[in-house]
């Protein structure tokens, strides 16, 4: 598991109150992990803080799974 994947899973676990062990990369924040719209906004803000990046609203709306969050972070994280 990559460092970014591990960090994303940790944030998802903290924000959504689920066990890291229950988070799979294909998990949907809403359908599988029980997030509501406020949870997803807070999740995006936590990802922005963790990875020191900005996620525009139109991009944030497209991040609906753990894998999409990992992919976005990998593509936009400052090295």
Swiss-Prot record:
Keyword tags: Cytoplasm, Fatty acid biosynthesis, Fatty acid metabolism, Lipid biosynthesis, Lipid metabolism, Phosphopantetheine, Phosphoprotein
PTM note: 4'-phosphopantetheine is transferred from CoA to a specific serine of apo-ACP by AcpS. This modification is essential for activity because fatty acids are bound in thioester linkage to the sulfhydryl of the prosthetic group.
GO biological process assignments: lipid A biosynthetic process
GO cellular component terms, semicolon-separated: cytosol; membrane
Pathway: Lipid metabolism; fatty acid biosynthesis
SUPFAM superfamilies: ACP-like
Residue span(s) of domain Carrier: 2-77
Bilayer-spanning residue ranges: none
Similarity comment: family membership: Belongs to the acyl carrier protein (ACP) family.
UniProt-listed NCBIfam families: acyl_carrier, PRK00982.1-2, PRK00982.1-3, PRK00982.1-4, PRK00982.1-5
Protein name: Acyl carrier protein
């Amino acid at each position: 598991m990559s460092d970014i994947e591990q960090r994303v899973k940790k944030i998802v676990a903290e924000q959504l109150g689920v066990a890291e062990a229950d988070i799979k990369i294909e998990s949907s924040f809403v359908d599988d992990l029980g997030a509501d719209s406020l949870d997803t906004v807070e999740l995006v803000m936590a990802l922005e803080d963790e990875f020191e990046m900005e996620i525009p609203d139109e991009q944030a709306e497209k991040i609906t799974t753990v894998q999409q969050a990992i992919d976005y972070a990998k593509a936009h994280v400052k090295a």
